[in-house]
Amino acid sequence: METTVRKQKKNLETKKPSIYSLQLHEMQDWLKEQGEPKFRAGQIFDWLYKKRVKNYEDMSNLSKGLRDKLSNSFDITTLKTLVKQTSSDGTIKFLFQLYDGYSIETVLMRHEYGNSICVTTQVGCRIGCTFCASTLGGLKRNLEAGEIVAQVVEVQRALDETEERVSSLVVMGIGEPFDNYDNLMGFLRIINHEKGLHIGARHMTVSTSGIIPKIYKFAEEDLQINFAISLHAPNSELRSKLMPINRAYKLPDLMEAIKYYVNRTGRRITFEYGLFGGENDQVEHAEELAALLKGVKCHVNLIPVNYVPERDYVRTPREQIFLFEKTLKDRGVNVTIRREQGHDIDAACGQLRAKERKEETR
């Protein structure tokens, strides 16, 4: 019997690219190289994203020769569902295993306006935010575009059972999306494409901790995707304590990049502000935050801290959260308090984490 480690080693040695990593034009180019007509790309995308088949044999309007070429060139089974947990509020957390034995978490959230999915872009994270579980083990590797796409496909398959659909997505799972920029953009274009899952750009949100060069690059992209910044502090000193990335990308420089983005795109930006008891949740912090954001086309999303066993932060009292919100509103800041979802299954903001690959036990 093969052990887990031997299976993982075999997977690494024989791994093929994921078919979900290909954009439509890339599929057309590949078909041309194979001597196949490019219109087949649309048929293949239809099987992948509309019918959501799990193997090439089900692609019945393709020749056996083409199905064999696809099978020999691309993996179609990208993720394996290990665990599926359902919260008391209907939130579902999926634990997916990757080809190399690592596992990632993806979350489906229920809203009155539809179903939203929170996707992961990396195995672990290098950013080191002091309140987040995702960074505890450091960064293991980037996900391929197809591994990000496959998260949405797998969740949509689960929703197919009740004839529901993923209507929006947020790139706020494990990892720093802008550290995996090219795969992130490939994923977004595939998901947005009319031949793909066709989720509208304005129904997608990307969040970053503040990789400044990529903010400027993102401002030049042709997708009208919503953009969020994990801010969490109104000044550089406090932000450096909470988020070490601020030592590399200073808050004043970050604000300049944000203003450029807003001016270049005309789009409103969202600032995510986690509230940590006794750290960044006082009235003076709210006043300082309002001053920092003055004149910026933005929205502030207040996030009560979620429990992480390895972290020491405590939740801000409810009355203090409301006072913080009121202080911002009184100063003209557009602000809301995020609705908590999935807290009881560790699926809320800051609680997702990558799992190590299993060690050989026999």
UniProtKB/Swiss-Prot annotation:
Family per record: Belongs to the radical SAM superfamily. RlmN family.
Highest rank taxon of the organism: Bacteria
The keyword Cytoplasm is assigned to this record: yes
Name of the molecule in the record: Probable dual-specificity RNA methyltransferase RlmN
Organism annotation: Bacillus cereus (strain ATCC 14579 / DSM 31 / CCUG 7414 / JCM 2152 / NBRC 15305 / NCIMB 9373 / NCTC 2599 / NRRL B-3711)
Main location group: cytoplasm
Subcellular location: Cytoplasm
Catalysed reactions listed for this entry: adenosine(2503) in 23S rRNA + 2 reduced [2Fe-2S]-[ferredoxin] + 2 S-adenosyl-L-methionine = 2-methyladenosine(2503) in 23S rRNA + 5'-deoxyadenosine + L-methionine + 2 oxidized [2Fe-2S]-[ferredoxin] + S-adenosyl-L-homocysteine; adenosine(37) in tRNA + 2 reduced [2Fe-2S]-[ferredoxin] + 2 S-adenosyl-L-methionine = 2-methyladenosine(37) in tRNA + 5'-deoxyadenosine + L-methionine + 2 oxidized [2Fe-2S]-[ferredoxin] + S-adenosyl-L-homocysteine
Pfam families xrefs: Radical_SAM (PF04055), RlmN_N (PF21016)
Residues annotated as binding S-adenosyl-L-methionine: G175, E176, S207, S230, L231, H232, N306
PROSITE patterns registered for this protein in UniProt: RADICAL_SAM
Cofactor: [4Fe-4S] cluster
Domain Radical SAM core: 111-344
Annotated Gene Ontology cellular component terms: cytoplasm
Function noted in UniProt: Specifically methylates position 2 of adenine 2503 in 23S rRNA and position 2 of adenine 37 in tRNAs.
